[in-house]
Amino acid sequence: MRFKTRVLLVSLLSLSLVVSGLACGPGRGYGRRRHPKKLTPLAYKQFIPNVAEKTLGASGRYEGKITRNSERFKELTPNYNPDIIFKDEENTGADRLMTQRCKDKLNSLAISVMNQWPGVKLRVTEGWDEDGHHFEESLHYEGRAVDITTSDRDKSKYGTLSRLAVEAGFDWVYYESKAHIHCSVKAENSVAAKSGGCFPGSALVSLSDGGQKAVKDLKPGDKVLAADGEGKLVYSDFIMFTDRDSATRRVFYVIETKEPVEKITLTAAHLLFVLDNSTDDLHSMTAAFASSVRAGQKVMVVDDSGHLKSVIVERIYTEEHQGSFAPVTAHGTIVVDRILASCYAVIEDHSLAHLAFAPVRLHHSVSSALFPQNFISQSNATLQQEGVHWYSKLLYHMGTWLLDSHVLHPLGMSVNSS
């Protein structure tokens, strides 16, 4: 019976994706598909994200040198991609050895390089290092780092190559030298390698009764402050958690505003509504990953008069918190700690994500209308379960099948973790 229910929901999902008129979100321009990003080259000595390489917000801590005789040597896999040139100065094949995550990102980057510059290939000058040529605790010793150039060694391309590496999903990219770009990834077992899109449990939302509640305490029947399709504040039904994890420590981005000083804390792959500094028109706002927001952009803050106001982002930094929660409302938006955010993550297209959850909204509307008391009690029992909701897992897997990998945030979703 459960299988039939899932088939029905998948059918409804497919139907919802072609009914574009069902999309809603703050602002009239909100439903427009985002144009392809313009690649902004990295500057010399710039690194992304703007934190130290071996912090949890980047590639994470050093876990120990791997040698050919160590138990962990089996973690390394050779990369024989014909579209990548390996310098291999040592003639040992060591530069081809890397972790699976590093291999996946490198192969993705190789495709981007050929698309960007026809006839040019990606070139790896350093991969796994077994000879001790790097500084102490270098991620090269674990097969988690590569130094790269283009095959034509055209230094004018290296800034753009750095940006392509960021887009390919490397966890830390550094325009380190005039001679190469340094890229690294998280360890395979890192709990931060897949962070999904969540808020810390202590984040506050506003309720229709005038009170506030921590995100972790939301229950069916709650109406929380959100925004409608015209960018007006409304109280929207809380429907479900797409992810509910009380235990895992994760890295969160903190987006802090200037005058008034407010801050919202969310994971890298979560969507936040932003405006460029040149406009205050709410209809021009778009949804961007938290990790892509920059100081000088604007976010939407609820002012003292109860209206949305665009406020400049002053600084961005990272914090670690235990517990993460991803609430979904009927409008697909939510005001958290006085700042407007999307309920969605992983894919940088709020309208598409909102369409994908149309079957969930339909189920909520019908069930709550026909069986209000039973629906709330049954939903309460379901919501207390830890982990990623099965429907979110389904959407994520469908997204990886149907969408270009560059559309999905590299920190995506850990569908097997809580």
Swiss-Prot record:
UniProt keyword annotations, A-Z: Autocatalytic cleavage, Calcium, Cell membrane, Developmental protein, Endoplasmic reticulum, Glycoprotein, Golgi apparatus, Hydrolase, Lipoprotein, Membrane, Metal-binding, Palmitate, Protease, Signal, Transferase, Zinc
Enzyme class: hydrolase
Lipidation (N-palmitoyl cysteine): 24
GO biological process: animal organ development; cell development; cell fate specification; cell-cell signaling; intein-mediated protein splicing; neuron differentiation; oligodendrocyte differentiation; pattern specification process
Site (described: Cleavage): 197-198
Keyword Glycoprotein: yes
Record motif Cardin-Weintraub, residues: 32-38
EC number: 3.1.-.-
Residue sites binding Ca(2+) 2 per the record: 90, 126, 129, 131
Binding site for Ca(2+) 1: 89-90, 95, 125-126
MF terms (GO), sorted A to Z: calcium ion binding; cholesterol-protein transferase activity; patched binding; peptidase activity
Record-listed Zn(2+) binding positions: 140, 147, 182
Lipid attachment in record (Cholesterol glycine ester): 197
Residues at the site labelled Essential for auto-cleavage: 270
First and last residue of the signal peptide: 1-23
GO cellular component terms attached to this protein's record: endoplasmic reticulum membrane; extracellular space; Golgi membrane; plasma membrane
Site residues, Involved in cholesterol transfer: 243
Annotated glycan sites: 277, 380
Record-annotated site: Involved in auto-cleavage: 267
InterPro entries: Hedgehog (IPR001657), Hedgehog_Hint (IPR001767), Hedgehog_sig/DD-Pept_Zn-bd_sf (IPR009045), Hedgehog_Signaling (IPR050387), Hedgehog_signalling_dom (IPR000320), Hint_dom_C (IPR003586), Hint_dom_N (IPR003587), Hint_dom_sf (IPR036844)
Subunit structure, interactors included: Interacts with HHATL/GUP1 which negatively regulates HHAT-mediated palmitoylation of the SHH N-terminus. Interacts with BOC and CDON. Interacts with HHIP. Interacts with DISP1 via its cholesterol anchor. Interacts with SCUBE2.
Record-stated family: Belongs to the hedgehog family.
Protein name: Sonic hedgehog protein
Species of the source: Carassius auratus
